[in-house]
A protein has these predicted regions:
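Acidic catalytic loop of the alpha/beta-hydrolase fold
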Residues: 231-235, 262-263
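Short alpha-helix in the alpha/beta-hydrolase fold that links the catalytic acid
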Residues: 213, 222, 236-245
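Membrane-embedded segments
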Residues: 45-142
Length: 299
């Protein structure tokens, strides 16, 4: 009888890890955010499926836009773009993801956010680890080829499992400006073993979706910021500490007091916007050749 649950986990693990939601609960231009955006379609190499996404340009100097009070805004001295890799429990229309996009824009970034295949507007079925890596590469190609964004102007931002995807992409592109991993884990095996009811199974033997960030992070060659809520009950913050310890300089770690897995905003000095501001300064020091520019970000 013990073999049946193991067989179930082996065969159905992709359906347990990825939870595609087709319906977008919010749009960027809904009143709560009022974000200007362009619908984009991203081609996946060697696939007929396309990824649906939103290009959200940085605010212009003349634009009045919604801001979080007492937080930094328009911090950039040269154009920069955030390539936002969401988690896999929701799609890009989730309130918390769009709140994050709005905060990025307040800081002066343009943002490309998209859904993995099978999610939201994107075509295709349940993805796999290899396929979400391919999807992130397709989004990178879109920024480089279609938007003509220089690689050093791209900050890759990954949230939860999206952090593992972002890390893989950043390793393949050491020319990127930097990497931010938020609420992410050391490996899928350890993330699953954190769930007590699954500890009875030989997860390491059954799991094919590895997402082994702890092994990979040693190969990273771009500046990195790890952010994690101290009250995260989904992925313990000590996993970000271990990733930080394994990573090479330049690196930063920001543990947000009382923040959970998704709702990470805390006002004042504990604000993740201020952490991103400090990281952006680190990125600029690491890439001093970037020309100063009064524009907020790439159009």
């Amino acid at each position: 009888m013990e073999k049946l649950p193991c067989l179930f986990l082996l065969l159905r693990q992709r359906h347990l890890i990825y939870r595609p939601a087709a319906e977008l609960s919010l749009q960027p231009d809904d009143a709560v955010f009022n974000l200007p955006h362009e619908d984009v379609w991203i081609s996946i190499p060697n696939s007929q499926a396309r990824l649906g996404g939103w290009w959200i340009p940085a605010p212009t100097q003349q634009e009045n836009f919604i801001v979080l009070p007492s937080e930094p805004s328009n911090i950039l001295t040269s154009p920069k773009v955030i390539l936002y890799l969401c988690g896999v429990g929701r799609n890009m229309g989730d309130y918390n993801y769009l709140a994050r996009v709005s905060a990025f824009r307040q800081l002066g970034f343009s943002v490309l956010v998209f859904d993995y295949r099978g999610y939201g507007l994107s075509e295709g079925d349940f993805p796999s680890e290899l396929q979400v890596y391919q999807d992130s590469q397709a989004a990178w190609n879109y920024l480089r080829d279609m938007r003509q964004i220089p690689p050093e102007q791209i900050i890759i931002y990954g949230e939860s499992l999206g952090g593992a995807i972002a890390l893989d992409l950043a390793i393949r592109h050491p020319e990127a400006g930097g990497l931010i991993m938020q609420s992410s884990f050391t490996s899928m095996t350890e993330a699953i073993q954190h769930r007590r009811f699954l500890q009875i199974f030989p997860v390491g033997l059954l799991l094919t979706e590895k997402f082994d960030s702890l092994s990979k992070v040693r190969s990273l060659r771009v500046p990195i910021l790890f952010m994690h809520g101290s009250a995260d009950s989904v992925v313990p913050s000590e996993m970000s500490q271990r990733l930080y310890d394994a990573a090479s300089e330049p690196k930063q770690l920001f543990i947000i007091p009382d923040a959970d897995h998704v709702k990470i905003y805390q006002p004042g000095e504990q604000s993740y916007l201020k952490a991103i501001q400090r990281f952006t300064e680190l990125v600029q020091q690491h890439n001093p050749g970037q020309p100063p520019n009064n524009s907020s970000a790439a159009d």
